[in-house]
């Protein structure tokens, strides 16, 4: 007999009495249930005896720990005996002995399910064994967290995954989109629930798949195999079942947390009025961010709007371009800059300057640029391909060849006097000027005239001219040129002679004729 055993005993009954006008009704004194059996003070499980009545003073935590340990050992003993004797689990339970308990009322069986081989998979034996195993998994996990140094039974194997189902009340609230709230934008809400709880969540059942899409069913995956039941999302039982959430995890604590978070989403969807669901509002905002259609709207602030209106703005009508003279843009933005319609037109430039002097200027940045002394004299900035090339001298091989000088004189132009001939004698001096005195007589012949090919060196002011050779008279001065004035002993130059009105006689390129002999 288990620690949870109950027994309905005969006792004083009031069924034969008339209570508040009710008619007399006779029922049986006792009712047989699946927990019926012979009461006992001790329960022998394996080699140990467990007390069925707690007589000591225990706290609530200690009583819970004892019940968990007792129930784990009892379930393990039943499964162990059924495995050793190759018998059914129902034969070891009071509910399985229908012959000994003719008044026992069993629960109705669910609709049958069949596997790929055509065998029924949800028999009473399979469902009872699965229920005992799930109960033991849960109790072992709870006992491991509450009992210090707890050791699970020897034949116990922890399942790879356990699962739970949460049915969604779609029939009660058909207007609420529970699937959309649980999934969220692109599955982010369901993914967040999985990260917070540590369990795996999946929406299954009718309505979990869009219309027009079919899911392949696999009859091998059913509720009887706990370790493989929900590894494949396409379950035969989930397709015909109502809409529900399947929570799969390796621990019951994670499953419990996932159940709590899922119920919060469902309750918020039911209790929130239309348009006031914060979860749905956040999902719509997140979806707009993902799609790139979010438009941020700021609340109206009167102070901010007033300060924005009072702020002085830029009057475009007062901007005058210095390049084209038009209104509404700066010179740096002018399209006609550097063209004939711009700086090269003095009339337009004068109009722009006159308008600029009369119109106030409100662009502070433009004023700072004009007042900056570094900008004075700065040329207009042009791209390199528009700048003029500097005057660089050409290399010798690119210079044009000049024609050689010709010995033949060109013919004189018509209407002009011919130039003086180099072979003709010089004209006589005018009568106003006296001829120079003849040189003094000398016995020596005059020196030969200097050659016209070699020019004498220019006189130097630093060095005195060399003295003439002895015995040779100095050459006479050229005709038509007055001798230099003598120097005064005081070192002061005499006043210049009066200017002559007559022009000097042209000099010939040939040597002058020698003077007549004395």
Swiss-Prot record:
A zinc finger (CCHC-type) spans 319-336. Residues 19-31, 363-381 have a biased composition (Basic and acidic residues). Belongs to the BBP/SF1 family. GO terms for biological process: mRNA processing; regulation of mRNA splicing, via spliceosome; RNA splicing. Residues 225-240 have a biased composition (Low complexity). InterPro entries: BBP-like (IPR045071), KH_1_KHDC4/BBP-like (IPR055256), KH_dom (IPR004087), KH_dom_type_1_sf (IPR036612), SF1-HH (IPR032570), SF1-HH_sf (IPR047086), Znf_CCHC (IPR001878), Znf_CCHC_sf (IPR036875). One of its GO terms (molecular function) is mRNA binding. Necessary for the splicing of pre-mRNA. Has a role in the recognition of the branch site (5'-UACUAAC-3'), the pyrimidine tract and the 3'-splice site at the 3'-end of introns. Residues 408-518 have a biased composition (Pro residues). Residues 1-47, 94-124, 202-241, 295-314, 337-518 are annotated as: Disordered. It comes from Debaryomyces hansenii (strain ATCC 36239 / CBS 767 / BCRC 21394 / JCM 1990 / NBRC 0083 / IGC 2968). The keyword Zinc-finger applies. The gene is BBP. This is Branchpoint-bridging protein. GO terms for cellular component: spliceosomal complex.
């Amino acid at each position: 007999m288990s620690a949870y055993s109950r027994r309905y005993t005969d006792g004083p009954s009031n069924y034969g009495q008339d209570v508040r006008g009710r008619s007399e009704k006779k029922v049986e004194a006792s009712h047989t249930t699946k927990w019926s059996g012979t009461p006992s003070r001790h329960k022998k499980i394996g080699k140990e005896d467990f007390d069925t009545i707690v007589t000591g003073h225990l706290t609530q935590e200690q009583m819970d720990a004892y019940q968990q340990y007792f129930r784990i050992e009892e379930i393990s003993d039943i499964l162990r005996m059924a495995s050793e004797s190759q018998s059914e689990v129902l034969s070891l339970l009071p509910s399985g002995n229908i012959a000994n308990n003719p008044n026992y009322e069993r629960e109705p069986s669910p609709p049958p399910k069949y596997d790929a081989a055509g065998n029924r998979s949800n028999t009473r034996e399979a469902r009872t064994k699965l229920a005992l195993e799930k109960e033991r998994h849960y109790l072992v996990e709870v006992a491991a967290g509450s009992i210090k140094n707890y050791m699970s039974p020897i034949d116990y194997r922890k399942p790879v995954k356990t699962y739970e189902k949460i049915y969604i009340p779609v029939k009660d609230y058909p207007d609420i989109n529970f699937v959309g709230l649980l999934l969220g934008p692109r599955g982010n809400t369901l993914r967040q629930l999985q990260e917070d709880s540590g369990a795996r969540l999946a929406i299954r059942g009718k309505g979990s798949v869009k219309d027009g899409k079919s899911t392949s069913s696999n009859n091998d995956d059913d509720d009887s195999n706990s370790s493989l039941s929900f590894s494949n999302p396409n379950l035969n039982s989930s397709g015909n079942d109502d809409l529900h959430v399947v929570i799969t995890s390796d621990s019951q604590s994670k499953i419990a947390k996932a159940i709590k978070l899922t119920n919060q989403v469902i309750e918020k969807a039911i209790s929130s009025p239309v348009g006031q669901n914060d979860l749905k509002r956040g999902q719509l905002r997140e979806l707009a961010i993902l799609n790139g259609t979010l438009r941020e709207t700021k609340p109206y602030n009167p102070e901010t709007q007033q300060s924005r209106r009072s702020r002085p703005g830029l009057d475009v009508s007062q901007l005058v371009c210095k390049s084209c003279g038009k209104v509404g843009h700066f010179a740096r933005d002018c399209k006609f800059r550097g063209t004939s319609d711009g700086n090269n037109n003095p009339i337009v430039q004068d109009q722009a300057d006159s308008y600029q002097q009369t119109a106030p200027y409100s662009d502070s940045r433009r004023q700072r640029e004009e007042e900056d002394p570094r900008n004075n004299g700065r040329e207009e900035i042009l791209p390199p391909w528009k700048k003029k090339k500097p005057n660089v001298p050409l290399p010798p091989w690119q210079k044009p060849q000049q024609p050689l000088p010709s010995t033949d004189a060109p013919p004189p132009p018509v209407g002009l006097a011919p130039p003086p001939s180099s072979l003709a004698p010089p004209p006589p001096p005018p009568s106003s000027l006296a001829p120079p005195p003849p040189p003094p007589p000398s016995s020596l012949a005059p020196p030969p005239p200097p050659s016209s090919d070699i020019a004498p060196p220019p006189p130097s002011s630093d060095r005195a001219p060399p003295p003439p050779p002895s015995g040779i008279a100095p050459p006479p001065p050229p005709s038509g040129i007055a001798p230099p004035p003598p120097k005064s002993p005081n070192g002061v130059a005499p006043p210049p002679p009066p200017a002559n009105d007559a022009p000097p006689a042209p000099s010939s390129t040939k040597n002058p004729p020698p003077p007549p002999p004395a």
